[in-house]
Regions:
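Short alpha-helical packing/oligomerization segments
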Residues: 75, 802-821
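Membrane-embedded and interfacial regions of multi-pass energy-transducing membrane proteins
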Residues: 2-726, 783, 787-789, 794-797, ...
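An acidic/histidine-cluster motif and surrounding catalytic segment
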Residues: 731
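Juxtamembrane boundary at the C-terminal end of a transmembrane helix
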Residues: 860-869
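Polytopic transmembrane helical bundles with strong interfacial aromatic enrichment
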Residues: 246, 686-692, 735-738, 746-754, ...
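Interfacial loop-to-transmembrane junctions
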Residues: 758-765, 823, 827-857
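Short alpha-helical catalytic segment bearing the HExxH-like zincin motif
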Residues: 691, 695, 734, 805-809, ...
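Membrane-helix interface segments
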Residues: 348, 758-764, 797, 801
C-alpha cells in the first residue's frame, strides 16, 4: 500500500491482500471458489470410485464418511454461493451505477473470513479426524456425549467452527449488499428497473440474512455442546434431535434458493442477450422470484416427513412445498417464451444457460415427488434424493458458469475461445447427466452408504464414468479461460449484439472508479454527469479517481486480512480447548484491547488523558483475570499444563483484539452518495441502514435460541421444566439487571443529545455512565453465574434448563461486552473532539445507540423467560 492509501499494481501480491475494491474482491471470491470446486470435486471422484462396486474399495468406513461430509459441506457452503457472489461483487455495483459497495472494508473482511474459514476446514483433516457426520450434520449423532468418534473429534469441531466463521462472512456480505442496493443506485434507477441479475442478488441476500442467522444459532448451540458440554441436542426428553432438524432445515431449504437465485438472474440476463429481446413477462418474473423468496421459509418441514411431527402439520407443509413450484413454472415459461419470440445466437453462455434450465426442470420435477408425504416415505434416504438434490444444485453452478463466459470479456478485455467453450459445454452436459441420471434408476441404493444390491452395479459404474467425464470438462474450461488472457482477441465495451445493462457501457475491463462520471437515469436514458451536473466527457470509460466520491474505490487496508487471520488461529485453538480453559484466552485478550485503544488511539489522535487511563487500566484488568485464573488452575501449573490449543487461541484472540482496534482507528473515508436513487431509505445514511439490517439478522439469531428454549420446554413439560430449575433461580438479580440496562439506554440517548449540542462534558459523562451500567450488569450476572455454577453445582449440563439459561444469557452477555468495547472506543474518540465539536457529527453515537437499545430489548424477553415464567 502506498503512503496515500492507494492500491499497488495488480501484478503485486500485496495488492490482493490489501484491496477493498469490489472488482478485486469479486475476482478473489471467484478464484477461491474455483479452488474449492476442485477440492470438493476430488472428494466427489473418490466417492464415485468407492461406488464402482458394492463394499469397501479404496476408502475405509470412516474415511468414506469423511469424504462424503467434506464433499457436501465444501460444495454447498464454500463453492456454490461464494462462486455466485464473486460475480455479484464484480457486477452488481456496475449494474446499479455505484462506484463500489457501501462498505468496502467490510467487503474485504467478508472475503477474508470466507477464505480463512476454508483454511480452518482444511486444517481439520490434520486434527485427529475431520468431520464425518454428513453435510446436514444431524444431531445428536454429532455431539460428544453421544458419539466420541471422529464426528466429535477436535477436527470435527474445527469443521463446525469453520462454518461459524463462514456464516459471519455471509452476514457481513448480506448487510453490505442490501445497503448498497437500497442506497447507491444511480439516480432514476428504481428497484424494479434494475437488471435481473441485481434483482436476484437483492432477493438472495434477504434470504441469506435470515436463513444464515438461524444456521448460526444452530452452530452456536452445537459448538456449546462440544466446548461447554451443554445438553441441547443430546437431550431425549426435550426433543433435542428434532430441534436440530428444525433449525437446520429452516436454513437449509432457503439455502436451495439462495444458491439458485443468482444463477436464475444470470440465466435471465443471458437469455435476453442471446435472444435479442427483453424478457417476456418481466414484471411477473420478478414477482414470482419474490414469492419464492418469501415461501422458502415456510416449507422446511417437508424434509422431516419421517419424524414424529403430526399429520396435519405435515399436510400443510406438503401443500406449501407443492405451491412453491408454481412461481418457478411461471419463470421457466417466461424464459422459454422469450427464446421462442427472439432470435437465438448459440454462443457458449447461452448453451450453459439453456443447460441450466433443462437440469433445473429435471431437479424440480423429481423434487415434487419428495413433497408428497406418501412418496417421501419411500424415497427419503435413497439415491433418488441424491440425484434430485444434485440436479437442483448443479443447475445453479451451470448457470453461473454461463455467467463466467458471458462476463469474461468484460472482466478481462479478451474473448474466450468459442470452440473450446462449446466443447466444455457438451462434455459437461453429457458427463453430468451420465453421472446423475442413472441414480434415479438405482434409486433404492441407500444414501451415504457404499453397499448396494448387485443389480445396481452397472448403473453405479455408468455414474462413475460420467463423473470423470464431467470433471475432465472443467480442465477444458480452465485451459480456455487461462490461455485466453494472453490471446489477441481484444474486445470493445460490449462484444454482444444486444445488451441493456450499465456494465456494458464502460471499457473492458472497467476502470478503478467504474464510470467516467456519475451515472444517472433521471432523464430516462443512461448519462454520465460531471461534477457540475452536466454530461461528462467520456473516453471509453477511463477516469481518474480525483473526487471524494471515487477515492475509496482505490483505497487499501491491511486490517480486514488481519482480522480474518486472527479468526483462523482463534478457531483452530478453540477446537481443541477443554471446557475448563474455554473462556480464558478471550478474557486475557480484553485488557489487550483496552491497551491497544490507548496506544493506537494516541498515535491516531495524539496522546491525551484518556489514552493514559486506558493504558493504566489494562494491567490491573489483566492482573485481576490472572488472579481468578490462579484460583481455578494455579498461576504456574495452569499455564504449564495448558495445551498448545490454549496458546493458539490466546494468540488469535490477542491478535484479533489489536486488529479490531486498528480497523476502528484507520482513516478510511467512504462518502455518502449525494446523487442516487435511495427509495425507501432516502433519509437513512449508509451506516444506519447497515446497522438496521445487521440487527434484523440478530433478531433471528436470538429468536432461534428463544424458540429452541420454548421447543425444548414444551417437549420436556412446561411445569416440570421450571420445577427442576426453580430452586436455582432468584428473581431479584434479573430484575436488577433489567433496571440497569433500561437506565443505560437512557444514558446513550442523553449522550447523543449532548453531542449534538456540542457539549464535551455531557457527551463523555453519559457515555461513561453507559459503560458503568454495562459493567454493573456484567458483575451482577457474573455473581449470579458463580452462585449457580460453583455453590449450587448447577452446571451447563445439569439439565436442559441449565443449558438454555447459560447459553442464551451468555450470548446476550457477549453482546453486552461488545457494547462495552465499542463505547470505550467512542469515549476515546470523543475525548479528542470527535462527535461533538464543530464540524463533527453525532451519528456514530446514534448508530451505537441502536445496537445498545437492541441489546436491552433482548433482555426484556430473556428476563421473564428465565426468571418468571
Amino acid at each position: 500500500m502506498s503512503d496515500d492509501g492507494h492500491l499497488p499494481p495488480k501484478s503485486s501480491v500485496k495488492r490482493w491482500l490489501v484491496t477493498t475494491n469490489h472488482k478485486d474482491i469479486g475476482i478473489l471470491y471467484t478464484a477461491t471458489a474455483i479452488f474449492t470446486l476442485v477440492l470438493a470435486g476430488i472428494f466427489g471422484l473418490l466417492i464415485r470410485v468407492q461406488m464402482w462396486e458394492s463394499g469397501a474399495f479404496i476408502l475405509s468406513d470412516i474415511g468414506y464418511n469423511q469424504v462424503v461430509s467434506a464433499h457436501g459441506l465444501l460444495m454447498v457452503f464454500w463453492f456454490l454461493s461464494p462462486f455466485a457472489f464473486g460475480v455479484a461483487n464484480y457486477f452488481v455495483p456496475l449494474q446499479i451505477g455505484a462506484d463500489d459497495l457501501a462498505f468496502p472494508r467490510v467487503n474485504a473482511l467478508s472475503y477474508w473470513l470466507y477464505f480463512f474459514s476454508i483454511i480452518i476446514f482444511a486444517v481439520s483433516f490434520f486434527q485427529e479426524a475431520t468431520f464425518s457426520g454428513g453435510w446436514t450434520m444431524y444431531a445428536p449423532l454429532n455431539v460428544p456425549t453421544v458419539d466420541a468418534s471422529s464426528v466429535a473429534s477436535v477436527g470435527g469441531f474445527a469443521a463446525v467452527l469453520a462454518l461459524v466463521v463462514f456464516t459471519a462472512s455471509v452476514t457481513l456480505g448480506s448487510v453490505n449488499f442490501l445497503t448498497t442496493i437500497y442506497r447507491m443506485r444511480a439516480k432514476g434507477l428504481r428497484s424494479r428497473d434494475m437488471p435481473l441479475f441485481s434483482i436476484s442478488i437483492l432477493l438472495t441476500v434477504w434470504m441469506m440474512l435470515f436463513a444464515f442467522a438461524a444456521l448460526l444459532a444452530a452452530l452456536l448451540v452445537l459448538s456449546s455442546e462440544h466446548l461447554l458440554a451443554t445438553e441441547y441436542f443430546a437431550s431425549e426428553e426435550a426433543g433435542g434431535g428434532l430441534l436440530w432438524t428444525h433449525l437446520w432445515w429452516f436454513f437449509g431449504h432457503p439455502e436451495v434458493y439462495i444458491v439458485f437465485f443468482p444463477a436464475l438472474g444470470v440465466i435471465a440476463e443471458i437469455v435476453q442477450t442471446f435472444s435479442g429481446r427483453r424478457l417476456v413477462g418481466r414484471k411477473w418474473f420478478i414477482i414470482a422470484m419474490a414469492l419464492v423468496a418469501i415461501q422458502s421459509f415456510i416449507v422446511w418441514m417437508h424434509h422431516m416427513f419421517l419424524t414424529s411431527i403430526n399429520l396435519p402439520i405435515k399436510t400443510v407443509m406438503m401443500v406449501t412445498t407443492i405451491g412453491i413450484s408454481l412461481p418457478f413454472d411461471l419463470m421457466v415459461f417466461a424464459l422459454i417464451y422469450t427464446m421462442i419470440k427472439g432470435r437465438i445466437r448459440w454462443k457458449t453462455p447461452f448453451l450453459f444457460a439453456l443447460g441450466a434450465i433443462l437440469i433445473f426442470i429435471v431437479g424440480g420435477i423429481t423434487g415434487v415427488f419428495l413433497g408428497a408425504i406418501v412418496l417421501d416415505y419411500s424415497f427419503r434416504g435413497t439415491y433418488w434424493v441424491t440425484a434430485h438434490f444434485h440436479y437442483a444444485m448443479a443447475s445453479a453452478a451451470v448457470g453461473i458458469i454461463g455467467g463466467i463466459y458471458y462476463w469474461y470479456p468484460k472482466m478481462t478485455g479478451k474473448m474466450y475461445n468459442e470452440f473450446l467453450g462449446k466443447v466444455h459445454f457438451v462434455s459437461a452436459f453429457i458427463g453430468f447427466n451420465l453421472l446423475y441420471f442413472p441414480m434415479f434408476v438405482a434409486w433404492e441404493t441407500p444414501r451415504r452408504w457404499f453397499h448396494y444390491d448387485a443389480g445396481f452395479t452397472i448403473w453405479h459404474q455408468m455414474a462413475t464414468v460420467g463423473a470423470f467425464l464431467f470433471a475432465a470438462s472443467f480442465l477444458v474450461m480452465f485451459y480456455n479461460l487461462f490461455m485466453s488472457l494472453y490471446s489477441d482477441r481484444v474486445v470493445d465495451d460490449s462484444p454482444w449484439a444486444y445488451t441493456e445493462s450499465t456494465e456494458w457501457t464502460v471499457s473492458s475491463p472497467p476502470p478503478e472508479g467504474n464510470f467516467p462520471g456519475t451515472p444517472s437515469f433521471a432523464s430516462g436514458r443512461l448519462e454520465f454527469l460531471g461534477a457540475d451536473g452536466g454530461e461528462a466527457q467520456t473516453d471509453g470509460g477511463m477516469a481518474d479517481a480525483t473526487d471524494a466520491v471515487e477515492q475509496h474505490a482505490d483505497h487499501a487496508s491491511w486490517w480486514p486480512f488481519m482480522i480474518g487471520f486472527s479468526a483462523l488461529w482463534t478457531m483452530i485453538g478453540i477446537s481443541g480447548l477443554p471446557t475448563s480453559y474455554s473462556v480464558w484466552p478471550i478474557l486475557f485478550a480484553l485488557p489487550v484491547f483496552v491497551g491497544a485503544l490507548g496506544i493506537i488511539g494516541a498515535r491516531r489522535d495524539g496522546f491525551g488523558p484518556i489514552h493514559g487511563l486506558y493504558l493504566g487500566a489494562a494491567m490491573p484488568l489483566l492482573s485481576a483475570f490472572l488472579l481468578v485464573f490462579h484460583a481455578h488452575h494455579g498461576i504456574v501449573s495452569g499455564f504449564v499444563e495448558a495445551s498448545n490449543y490454549f496458546y493458539i487461541t490466546l494468540f488469535g484472540a490477542v491478535f484479533g483484539a489489536v486488529s479490531f482496534v486498528g480497523y476502528g482507528y484507520e482513516s478510511f473515508s467512504v462518502p455518502e452518495p449525494d446523487f442516487a436513487e435511495q427509495w425507501p431509505f432516502k433519509d437513512v445514511k449508509n451506516t444506519k441502514l447497515g446497522m438496521w439490517v445487521f440487527l434484523a439478522s440478530d433478531i433471528v439469531l436470538f429468536g432461534a435460541l428463544i424458540g429452541a428454549y420454548g421447543f425444548m420446554r414444551i417437549n420436556y413439560g412446561w411445569t416440570d421444566w421450571w420445577a427442576d430449575a426453580s430452586v436455582h433461580m432468584a428473581v431479584w438479580p434479573g430484575l436488577l439487571n433489567t433496571y440497569i440496562l433500561l437506565a443505560s439506554s437512557f444514558t446513550v440517548v442523553l449522550a447523543m443529545a449532548y453531542a449534538r449540542r456540542g457539549s464535551r462534558r455531557g457527551t463523555l459523562g453519559f457515555l461513561g455512565l453507559t459503560f458503568a451500567g454495562a459493567s454493573i450488569f456484567l458483575m451482577n450476572k457474573g455473581y449470579e453465574w458463580y452462585e449457580h455454577y460453583i455453590h449450587q453445582g448447577w452446571v451447563f449440563n445439569t439439565d436442559p434448563m441449565a443449558s438454555t439459561y447459560y447459553l442464551t444469557t451468555g450470548l446476550h452477555a457477549a453482546h453486552v461486552v461488545v457494547g462495552m468495547l465499542l463505547v470505550l472506543f467512542i469515549i476515546a474518540r470523543a475525548s479528542k473532539g470527535a462527535y461533538w465539536s464543530e464540524g463533527e457529527s453525532a451519528d456514530t453515537i446514534e448508530y451505537y445507540g441502536l445496537y445498545w437499545h437492541f441489546v436491552d430489548i433482548v433482555w426484556l424477553f430473556l428476563f421473564p423467560l428465565f426468571y418468571i415464567l
